[in-house]
């Protein structure tokens, strides 16, 4: 069994290279800003698209004096720009959610606001429904729109005046949002006529090229600062945008599971090499290995562009020892080769499991207690804000409710990150740019043309931040929102400084309440959420690996649900990894160390899942009745052993339990190989050879991951909840 020789050797490898100790927070944050704000290919055009859409929306709303101008301008920046189809779907979802929120609000208001007790209960119920929708809706953008329309409209019903006027005001806000969505879709369509680039392929190629250049230069012992700087920028930007692009259905490319794995592995290559600075420790004997890896990346780049190329790229022949940096790069590069260049007859698309139809709510919307806990905490924070600004008769503080919505997340790190970005965005957009323009610029403007130039200039700044990675893009949206709330408060430019004061104080009130409620009532540190998600994925993958009966619709639905949940957890782990960077305190260094380890294991787990998907496809495409009984028994035994190994890895990760040994799964593979060769007289068909190849790769990855987790237990880390 040559395929199993490699796992046995690599089990004894040391932990893959880990990033060096992190610098102090302020030093890291300064470097973070420098890297995030550097230009990259396509960034200027993307920022221009944001600016054009927001500016046209502003001109139409101001020209026709529509209420809700600030909300309309904000939603022109909120829609996704990943592709025209995603913008269209996001726009439709936003309008539908806004319409549902408006209908819920108006029905409740008309029925309940006339009596003080029912009015107060209606306010609490509205806040609860808003936050429950934010947590339980499958589309986060739609959930945000649903929650925003409720929390923005509730305070309006506390004011005196005829009901008809308040109903009309709510409907005008809906009209402003619909106008902003329409303008954004039209602008994206216009730009799509001139931009035919494949952003996903281009982004992957740029990252692979940056790694290839550094490897080639290090083989010659002459690494340039420019090459390392470009690599560091890609490491700082991350691959979150590429992950979202990979999830976009496109029949011209590979399936989304394989593309997501490719993106993760390309990002891992960058993450391994970017922090490395000790090139002087590499000897001349390492130069051939470095050059071989650079050549392998060139082949992978050609494979990436030649989508219909059936040529299989052969693995590198590398020694099993040497510097840890080289071992980590070679392992990741081999996983990338498996993802981009699968063996003949090896498919990764599970054709029998069609994508689930899009649903408004998440599958666990009504039985996951986390949604209820989240809604209760969000409702409490919003109710406290509402009670306070009504008690002191300061209605201008109602922006605190908006702050509660846009900073509400489930973990401390993510919440802290959003609160920091919300406050700093409001400070720059509201105080510096908003009040500054009111005092210094607006008195000199007397035409819409001058106001448009000022508006576009501020939007360009916000759009540049918006085109950063997810760690900083939120700051751009909050900068724009704070500026829009001041300058688009009425049908004409505002010179009243009390508007800016009220907005800033409202934001502060919302941040204080969110801190009190979310960080004192059970929110977990982001690194703890990362660990729980990673462990949950191990258990879900173990369940996915177990034998499945053939052809039962209930089983197919269960498989589809498992796939979707595992993919969601992969994305959530990466999102929480970004949030860990914003956690402070004595445990920050330990949290960053845990984060680095999880990010190192994440691509391996993704690759293992990809192989599970491929293996299950072969199981489902052939009826057990059409196979020899010996192969069916051996295949079932092997699937059970894969399930057992993954559960063993989960125990090793959760409890530092090192009792799991790979001997049983290797014996199960030997039985499967013997059954196939014996049944087909040593000439198995291509499908059976592919099953053996995938099974061997699963063993290799599982053994490697188990060895690395056993070699690096989380000493001193808090236990994971069961």
Q: Where does each model-flagged region fall?
A:
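Alpha-helical transmembrane segments of multi-pass membrane proteins
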Residues: 75-76, 375-387, 397-408, 423-435, ...
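C-terminal functional regions that serve as terminal interaction/effector modules
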Residues: 439-443, 448-449, 456-461, 468-495, ...
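Membrane interface segments of multi-pass transport proteins and intramembrane proteases
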Residues: 107, 111-121, 443-449
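Long, hydrophobic alpha-helical segments that serve as membrane-spanning/inserting helices
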Residues: 2-47, 51, 59, 63, ...
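Juxtamembrane or sensor-core-proximal signal-transducing alpha helices
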Residues: 184-196, 516-527
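Hydrophobic alpha-helical transmembrane segments corresponding to the first two to three helices
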Residues: 418-422
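C-terminal structured interaction module
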Residues: 413, 423-431, 714-722
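Pore- and pathway-forming membrane helices of multi-pass small-molecule/ion transporters and channels
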Residues: 23-32, 48-88, 98-103, 120-189, ...
């Amino acid at each position: 069994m040559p395929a199993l020789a490699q796992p046995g050797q690599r089990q004894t490898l040391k932990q893959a290279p880990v990033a060096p100790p992190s610098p102090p927070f302020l030093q890291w944050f300064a470097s973070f800003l420098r890297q995030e704000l550097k230009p990259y290919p396509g960034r200027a055009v993307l920022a221009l698209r944001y600016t054009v859409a927001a500016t046209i929306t502003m001109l139409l709303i101001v020209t026709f004096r529509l209420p809700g101008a600030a909300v309309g301008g904000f939603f022109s920046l909120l829609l996704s720009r990943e592709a025209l189809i995603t913008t269209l779907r996001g726009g439709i979802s936003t309008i539908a959610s806004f319409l549902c929120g408006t209908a819920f609000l108006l029905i409740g208001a008309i029925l309940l606001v006339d009596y003080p007790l029912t009015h107060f209960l209606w306010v609490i119920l509205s806040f609860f429904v808003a936050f429950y929708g934010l947590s339980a809706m499958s589309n986060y953008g739609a959930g945000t729109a649903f929650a925003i329309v409720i929390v923005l409209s509730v305070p309006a019903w506390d004011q005196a005046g005829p009901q008809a006027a308040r109903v009309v005001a709510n409907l005008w806000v809906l009209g402003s949002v619909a106008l902003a969505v329409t303008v954004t879709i039209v602008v994206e369509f216009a730009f799509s006529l001139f931009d035919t680039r494949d952003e996903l392929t281009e982004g992957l190629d740029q990252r692979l090229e940056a790694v290839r250049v550094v490897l080639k230069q290090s083989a010659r012992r002459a690494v340039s600062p420019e090459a390392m700087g470009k690599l560091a920028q890609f490491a700082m930007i991350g691959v979150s945008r590429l992950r979202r692009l990979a999830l976009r259905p496109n029949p011209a490319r590979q399936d989304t599971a394989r593309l997501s794995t490719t993106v993760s592995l390309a990002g891992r290559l960058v993450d391994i090499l970017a922090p490395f600075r000790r090139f002087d420790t590499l000897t001349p004997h390492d130069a051939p290995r470095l050059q071989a890896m650079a050549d392998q990346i060139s082949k992978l780049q050609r494979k990436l562009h030649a989508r219909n190329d059936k040529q299989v790229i052969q693995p590198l022949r590398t020694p099993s020892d040497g510097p840890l940096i080289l071992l980590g790069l070679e392992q990741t590069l081999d996983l990338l080769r498996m993802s981009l260049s699968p063996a003949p007859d090896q498919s990764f698309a599970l054709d029998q499991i069609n994508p689930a139809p899009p649903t408004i709510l998440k599958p666990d919307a009504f039985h996951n207690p986390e949604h209820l806990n989240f809604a209760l905490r969000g409702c409490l924070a919003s109710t406290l804000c509402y009670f306070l600004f009504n008690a002191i008769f300061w209605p201008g503080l109602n922006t605190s409710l908006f702050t509660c919505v846009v900073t509400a997340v489930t973990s401390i790190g993510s919440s802290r990150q959003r609160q920091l970005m919300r406050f700093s965005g409001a400070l720059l957009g509201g105080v510096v740019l908003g009040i500054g323009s009111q005092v210094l610029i607006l008195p000199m403007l007397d035409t819409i043309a001058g106001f448009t130039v000022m508006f576009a200039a501020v939007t360009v700044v916000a759009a540049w931040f918006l085109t950063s990675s997810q760690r900083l893009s939120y700051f751009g949206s909050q900068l724009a929102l704070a500026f829009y709330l001041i300058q688009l408060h009425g049908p004409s430019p505002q010179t009243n400084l009390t508007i800016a004061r009220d907005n800033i104080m409202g934001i502060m009130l919302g941040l204080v309440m969110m801190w009190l409620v979310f960080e004192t009532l059970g929110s977990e540190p982001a690194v703890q959420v990362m660990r729980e998600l990673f462990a949950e994925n191990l258990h879900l993958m173990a369940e996915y690996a177990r034998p499945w009966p053939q052809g039962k619709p209930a089983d197919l639905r269960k498989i589809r649900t498992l796939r979707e949940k595992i993919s969601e957890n992969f994305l959530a782990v990466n999102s929480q990894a970004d949030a860990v960077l914003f956690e402070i305190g004595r445990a920050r260094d330990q949290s960053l160390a845990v984060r680095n380890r999880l990010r190192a294991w994440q691509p391996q787990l993704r690759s293992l899942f990809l192989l599970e998907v491929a293996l299950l496809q072969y199981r489902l495409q052939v009826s057990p009745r059409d196979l020899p009984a010996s192969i069916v028994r051996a295949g079932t035994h092997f699937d059970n052993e894969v399930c057992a190994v993954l559960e063993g890895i989960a125990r090793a990760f959760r409890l530092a339990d090192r009792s799991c040994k790979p001997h049983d799964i290797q014996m199960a593979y030997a039985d499967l190989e013997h059954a196939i060769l014996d049944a087909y007289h040593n000439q198995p068909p291509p499908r059976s050879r592919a099953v053996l190849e995938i099974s061997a790769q699963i063993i290799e990855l599982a053994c490697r991951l188990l060895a690395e987790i056993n070699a690096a237990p989380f000493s001193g880390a808090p236990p994971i909840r069961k």
